[in-house]
Structures are given as C-alpha cells and as structure tokens.
Amino acid sequence: MHYVSVEGLGKSYGVKPLFEDITFHIEEGDKIALVARNGSGKSTLLKILAGKETAESGTVWIHKDVTVALFEQEPVFAEGKSVLDNIFYHNHPVINAIREYERAEDEGDADRMTDAIVKMDELGAWDFDTKVKQILGKLNIHHLQQTAGSLSGGQRKRVALAKTLIDIGFEHKHVLLIMDEPTNHLDVEMVEWLEHYLNQEKVTLLLVTHDRYFLDAVCEEIWELDG
C-alpha cells in the first residue's frame, strides 16, 4: 500500500532555506532513517508530514486510510491532568474501560476494581490491556495519578513515548509512525526493548535519531537531508 508521496517540498525561516525541492515516497512496511546535520530541518520536515507545520512549496499526499502518529522531542500534555488521562485520552469504550481499570488498580479501590473487571470482560479488553501494561512497565511508568505538569524532562519523554505506542496499537491499522529522537532519556534496557518492539510490530516508520546502533537495528533505509 502506498502511504505517502512528497513532491518538491521546500521550507525556509526568514531568508535562509531549511530545505528545497525534496521528493520522496513511503510504502507500507518501510522503515526509514532521516539523517542530516543539526539545523537542516529534520524536525520541521517531520512536523510538516504530521500536519503541524506547513511547507512553503511542494505537495504532501497521504493516503486517506493512513493515520500519522508523531513522537516529538518536546511533547505537549494537558499539564493539569494525570498521566493516566493524558495517555488514555480517547473517548472509546475499550479505552474508557482500561482507564477506569488502571485508575482503580492504581488507587487500590476494590469496589471500583470489581466493576472495572466486569466491564473489561464485557468488552474483551484484556489483550490490549496486557500490551498497555507491557509498554508502561518497560518504560518505568508507574505513578499514573501524577499530574503531567509535575513530570521531569525524562519522565515526559517516556510518557509521551508510551502514549504514542499505545495510540498506534489501539486504533489504526495503517499508521505512519514518525519518531524524532525517541531514545533520548531512555536507559540501555529501554532502548533495547523499543528496538525489539518496533521490529515485532512491523510498523511503517520514519525515524530521526543520533543513536546509530538503534538506527541500524530498526531501519532498512537511510535518507540524507541536504542542507
């Protein structure tokens, strides 16, 4: 399946061009690393693909059935809400059930836990909850009632990574996962787990990273952005 076509893309800040006349195509199952010197516009290009910035020239076509999931270097949260509510923000019966189950478990509320278990059974939500617990555990995310605004920089990155992985695992069959420096603030064990997870999940991936070992382990193509 053809996911993305980019033709003649250009972007500048002031009089200085970040990049010009970029053309590429992404197919389902591609795992691509984007490399360039600092300041060449890698992060900007990723944001354009995700619809968070606009190009000054060229076109971006994304298949109507493809959802773009962007993991950014500076994640944005609802600062006053809990980690739990930031991760499980979808209004969907399965997500609502898992959110209620995780909240009851985190707070040790036996009555709410019983009700939540019944709802999880009704919706067949246990398989996805198992995946959620694996992601949270591997990324060392345990205090789900903590507010997002109280998280350290490293915690914010790990919560954002968990949120991204849970999103792509839950809702969409056809996802282009765009990741901007995902291994920053991860220890060696977490990086190895993320490498295994991305390979196991067979995602379509566009990656920016300075971690050459991670890049070689996960990606099958390397594109160089001139600038």
Predicted regions located by residue number:
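ABC ATP-binding cassette signature C-motif
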Residues: 1-227
